[in-house]
């Protein structure tokens, strides 16, 4: 279980109920508690938010003897596993969730405005995600979602043809409803969508999200440690990606109770106060039923 002092630790079952660690910088939270917890937890998978990379350097060599080690770094594609949010879209609800998070992250801190623009931005993003899913697998990524929006703004007739070619009557009907808005209104919606997708114009982000090498199902089957390396200073910039990643991961873990042979999954969220994870309160309240627990370190 989680280590709570030099000679004490929680039981595995009690660790499902989460642990909050607080203390000033230099108080030994990382080296005294987190390091020991990470090295002593066995027969499980770990998701570790490690902005500074300190935990990776302290533990990855030891952990690699018995577990698969992966990293997720949105600012450095050469050191990162791939994470494509579109890879996990199975039904229309999943499209709506991704679109909602993209728009909500962009509007965070700007409450009180007309909800019309946010709702229509979500509708347009949802529509274009669905359109991408009709294309070959290699084209289904966030950079191409940005391209679709840009083509829609500059060459709408090309998008008309792609929509018709998809052969989806419902999609075509929704597209017709969208383009029926007055030109000025449509331009404002597109501008709002571009702002929501701006992060994916970053070359490194585009590369990391162009493919997917993170299989959430493997977390329950084989001991795996995933280190998330995005510096504290970059958390606001990558807030959209963090929100989508944790939304999809928590959603997967909460989708069904694990069988008796499945591995536990634990989270170590260093510098948790800098993360934007809308689903975190709900996840903390419910994950114990799914044999998962979290250390929240502030």
Q: Where does each model-flagged region fall?
A:
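P-loop NTPase motor domains
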Residues: 3, 10-293
